[in-house]
Amino acid sequence: MATKKAGGSTRNGRDSEAKRLGVKRFGGESVLAGSIIVRQRGTKFHAGNNVGMGRDHTLFATADGKVKFEVKGEKSRKYVVIVTE
């Protein structure tokens, strides 16, 4: 005979896989064209000069240079810019 009463089932116990979002290259870092700078959901950061945006809002360098983060405009938007040497 069992000495332990049967436990009930649960509807919890699931979680989604981490998506590894965030800034990948920080201000002042040198990057090559095509390097991913920010992985994000939506436009937390906007694309500035020499920066492109992928269809999942990933920001990437379109030219070699140094990464710079700027806050511009009436709405104080955060822009990522590549400063070429």
UniProtKB/Swiss-Prot annotation:
GO terms for biological process: translation. This is Large ribosomal subunit protein bL27. It comes from the Bacteria. Pfam families: Ribosomal_L27. Keywords: Ribonucleoprotein, Ribosomal protein. Belongs to the bacterial ribosomal protein bL27 family. GO terms for molecular function: structural constituent of ribosome. Residues 1-20 are annotated as: Disordered. GO terms for cellular component: cytosolic large ribosomal subunit. InterPro entries: Ribosomal_bL27, Ribosomal_bL27_CS. The keyword Ribonucleoprotein applies. Gene3D superfamilies: 2.40.50.100.
